[in-house]
């Protein structure tokens, strides 16, 4: 059964703190093994990549076969169900519309001294997109990563996706084409991350790597950070639902299970000021589990990491929600807009009973690549700015240099950097 915490109980604070500290990923120390793979690919390139692909994916391939051909992608698209392709196109179009509104504008102005200042935005030249492989790979995630890069103007988007024993979900290749991916390679794991970061004879290096993966992929992204940029280190998914007595227990239960079926380590949380609703939701979860195809995974998630938190009022719910800083936050109350305005920490907020988080996963338009494990306290979901960089611009004429130069020289000398002061002074003399 999920944990039950009641803010009216004397032990609430320590129990809530323990709940926040719960670790949902238990893995052996894989840093050394990952480092060996990364270093090998950095040193030996294609040879190491091909060996690792044979070992881990049971796929024999040569350098020429690492890249999916246009004919293979055409065949994959042709194999896809027409209705599913139409749904992917709808998702692509809505994701593009939402993300185009994030495009920043260059800025240039002249201050009171006549100094010109500004900022210029440019797209990252090349980005790598990691996609988990196998038949369960998610084409929606391809769109969520690729479309913002396309909108940002990234010239080269490279996708890597493992194809264990040669198997791949054709929808993943179809989504890549719809999302504007430039190149697709049948490699995965830490070796694929290393290839993107360091480059091989076949795969040219990129400047940034985005996309989710297993513990080895996460470790590899940590290890190559600095050589390239990365988006985030994603943990198991999570949803928090805040509801009052107006909430529909069956709908809330369905949303909690939609998150729980992702992964046995996923987390579904309900905060409510209604004890009756809490009981109804718990019963509805059990009823719906009985008919869920992925019931084993969902039940493990709900029993091990699920939580029902009772509060005296919604003011308490706001405080707790900010502490949890959930990846997904659904608000099903009489005034969801008013409550949302008071919450600072959440990856994405879904307002009202007719906005299930699953709509955001697929066709809402907002991005479903979101900060997990309380990192919404300091980070945001994936967006256009993750694929762009800002360059500042400064221009002084002779008059402006004369006005600012003496102060710059004073500060340079104060810091013991005489050459700094001199580089200004030679222009003033």
Swiss-Prot record:
The keyword DNA-binding does not apply. It holds the Pfam family Histidinol_dh. Pathway: Amino-acid biosynthesis; L-histidine biosynthesis; L-histidine from 5-phospho-alpha-D-ribose 1-diphosphate: step 9/9. The keyword Hydrolase does not apply. GO terms for biological process: L-histidine biosynthetic process. The active site is at 327 (proton acceptor), 328 (proton acceptor). Keywords: Amino-acid biosynthesis, Histidine biosynthesis, Metal-binding, NAD, Oxidoreductase, Zinc. Its EC number is 1.1.1.23. GO terms for cellular component: cytosol. Disulfide bonds: none annotated. GO terms for molecular function: histidinol dehydrogenase activity; NAD binding; zinc ion binding. NAD(+) binds at residues 130, 191, 214. It comes from the Bacteria. Its cofactor is Zn(2+). Coiled coil: none annotated. Substrate binds at residues 237, 259, 262, 328, 361, 415, 420. Catalyzes the sequential NAD-dependent oxidations of L-histidinol to L-histidinaldehyde and then to L-histidine. HAMAP family: HisD (MF_01024). Belongs to the histidinol dehydrogenase family. This is Histidinol dehydrogenase. It comes from Nitrobacter winogradskyi (strain ATCC 25391 / DSM 10237 / CIP 104748 / NCIMB 11846 / Nb-255). The gene is hisD.
